[in-house]
C-alpha cells in the first residue's frame, strides 16, 4: 500500500506539471482516492498535497515531490524506531517490508507465522534468513503454542490501516497472534508510517478467492478474509518515523488527517 501511495503521488505530480487549472487536479485527486477507497495511506498523502496547494497546480507539483521524498523515508525511519526500542526474540507473521527492515536492523532471532493461505510469511522468513538472521517459520495455528512455551521480547507486525480508535487492520491472523501474545504476557507492537492512521474508523473487510482455501467439489461456503481487526487494547504501541504513538497520539494524527481532507470541501464550494 505504501508503494501504491507513492505511485499515486507520482501521477498527481506529473499531471500538475502539464495542466493549468485546479479543477482538473481536483478530479485527478478524487480518481486516485476512489480507485483505492480503503487505502488510508494513499488518501492521507494525496490530501496533504492538495490541502496546502492553495489551488495552484505549481504548488501541487512541488508539494507532491516533497511528499514522495517524505514517503520514501518514512518506512525506513519507522523501522529504525522499532529496532531501537525492541529486543528479541521477536514473533511476527505475514510480509511487511517495514517489519523486515526493522528485524534486519535488530538482528535477533525471529519466529515467522506463514500467513495462510498465500503464505506471505515465507517471503519474510526467506529474506531474513538470506541476510543471516536466525529464523524459525511455523504455521499460523502453531503460533499461540509457540508463544506460550518460548521466551519472546515482543511481537512485531505491520499494518494496512490503523483506525483512530487504535484498532489495527492487518493480515488475517494478526488478531489471533495478538490474543496469544496477551495470554503469554508478551507486548505487541505495530511498526508503520504514521500516514497509515486513518482519518475515520471505517473498516473495509476484503475477501480473497474461495479457491485459495478450497478448490474441491463439495457444496460448502468458504470464508477467506484478507484482513482482520485487532483491538487497540491488545497493542502496546505503534512505532512510527516520529517515535512511539500511544492512543492519544493516534487520535491526534487522525485529527490532522481529517483536517487535511477538508480541502475537498473547500474545492467543492469554490466550484459551485
List each language-model region with its residue ranges.
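Long amphipathic alpha-helical segments
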Residues: 1-69
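Gly/Ser/Thr-rich loops at beta-strand to alpha-helix junctions
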Residues: 2, 93-99, 117
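Glycine/charged-rich beta-loop-alpha catalytic/anionic-binding loops adjacent to active sites
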Residues: 27, 62-63, 109, 155-163
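Nucleotide/pyrophosphate-binding catalytic subdomain
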Residues: 61-65, 69, 76, 122-125, ...
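A short, well-structured juxtamembrane/interface segment
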Residues: 70-87
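Residues that mark the start of a beta-strand
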Residues: 88-89, 109
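Histidine-anchored nucleotide/phosphate-binding helix
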Residues: 96-107, 178
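Conserved phosphate- and dinucleotide-binding cores of soluble alpha/beta proteins
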Residues: 115-272
Amino acid at each position: 500500500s505504501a508503494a501504491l501511495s507513492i505511485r499515486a503521488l507520482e501521477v498527481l505530480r506529473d499531471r500538475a506539471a502539464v495542466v493549468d487549472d485546479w479543477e482538473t487536479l481536483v478530479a485527478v485527486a478524487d480518481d486516485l482516492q476512489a480507485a483505492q477507497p480503503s487505502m488510508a495511506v494513499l488518501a492521507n498523502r494525496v490530501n496533504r498535497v492538495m490541502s496546502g496547494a492553495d489551488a495552484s497546480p505549481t504548488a501541487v507539483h512541488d508539494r507532491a515531490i516533497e511528499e514522495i521524498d517524505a514517503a520514501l523515508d518514512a518506512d525506513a525511519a519507522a523501522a529504525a524506531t522499532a529496532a531501537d526500542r525492541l529486543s528479541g526474540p521477536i514473533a511476527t507473521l505475514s510480509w511487511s517490508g517495514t517489519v523486515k527492515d526493522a528485524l534486519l536492523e535488530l538482528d535477533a532471532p525471529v519466529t515467522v507465522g506463514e500467513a495462510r493461505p498465500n503464505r506471505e510469511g515465507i517471503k519474510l522468513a526467506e529474506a531474513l534468513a538470506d541476510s543471516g538472521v536466525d529464523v524459525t517459520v511455523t504455521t499460523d495455528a502453531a503460533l499461540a503454542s509457540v508463544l506460550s512455551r518460548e521466551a519472546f521480547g515482543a511481537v512485531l507486525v505491520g499494518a494496512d490501516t490503523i483506525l483512530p480508535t487504535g484498532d489495527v487492520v492487518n493480515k488475517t491472523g494478526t488478531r489471533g497472534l495478538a490474543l496469544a501474545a496477551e495470554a503469554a504476557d508478551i507486548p505487541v507492537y505495530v511498526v508503520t508510517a504514521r500516514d497509515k492512521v486513518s482519518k475515520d474508523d471505517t473498516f473495509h473487510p476484503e475477501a480473497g478467492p474461495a479457491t485459495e482455501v478450497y478448490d474441491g467439489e463439495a457444496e460448502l461456503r468458504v470464508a477467506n478474509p484478507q484482513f482482520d481487526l485487532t483491538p487497540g487494547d491488545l497493542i502496546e504501541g505503534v512505532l512510527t518515523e516520529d517515535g512511539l504513538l500511544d492512543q492519544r497520539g493516534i487520535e491526534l494524527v487522525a485529527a490532522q488527517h481529517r483536517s487535511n481532507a477538508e480541502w475537498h470541501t473547500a474545492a467543492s464550494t469554490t466550484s459551485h
